[in-house]
């Protein structure tokens, strides 16, 4: 489980034959094989690592429903330890899909509304974009808006978005469970 509070960004060193290679952040000192790390919000298991690199194996499904095949720099967050401080919101690392960045107006960033998931986008609700825990500021049939503070713009890859860039999204897990429970009644 993750919180959507990104620890750092990393450069994508390469992607070939389903193996994603990232530059290893200096403070990621105690890595182990099999450890879960959210990469642009997608939960991946460390396959191998060295002093300077971390390696992950990606399935075709992962490449098809995320932006990892096109990413140059990614957000990283290690899994929340059992005794860790919980901030952000519950992020499973199970990306729902990708959507397009439409425009920004100051601190307001607008994204394409994913039609099949629009019921999970509510004013003041949570969403993870590229693994970042965010609050929906407004929503309509075609788009939704989030507001980004300077720290988020500097610490994550959201500050480098260009119109048309695709971002990973994960809807609020609690909202998914709540809606499912209502449908089953």
Regions found by a protein language model. Give the residues of each.
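Conserved loop->alpha-helix
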Residues: 1-185
């Amino acid at each position: 489980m993750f919180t959507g509070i990104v620890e750092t960004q990393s450069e994508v060193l390469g992607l070939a034959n389903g193996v994603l290679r990232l530059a290893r952040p200096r403070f990621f000192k105690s890595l182990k094989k099999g450890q879960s790390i959210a990469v642009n919000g997608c939960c991946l298991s460390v396959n191998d690592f060295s002093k300077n690199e971390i390696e992950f194996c990606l399935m075709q499904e992962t490449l098809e429903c995320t932006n990892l095949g096109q990413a140059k720099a990614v957000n990283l967050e290690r899994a929340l330890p059992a005794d860790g401080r919980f901030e952000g919101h519950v992020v499973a690392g199970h990306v729902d899909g990708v959507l397009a960045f439409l425009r920004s107006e100051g601190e307001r960033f607008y994204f394409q509304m994913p039609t099949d998931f629009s019921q999970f986008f509510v004013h003041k609700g949570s969403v993870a974009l590229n693994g970042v825990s965010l609050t929906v500021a407004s929503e309509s049939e075609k788009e939704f808006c989030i507001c980004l503070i300077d720290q988020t713009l500097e610490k994550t890859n959201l500050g480098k978005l260009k119109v048309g860039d695709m971002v990973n999204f994960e809807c609020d897990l609690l909202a998914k469970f709540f809606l499912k429970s209502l449908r089953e009644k």
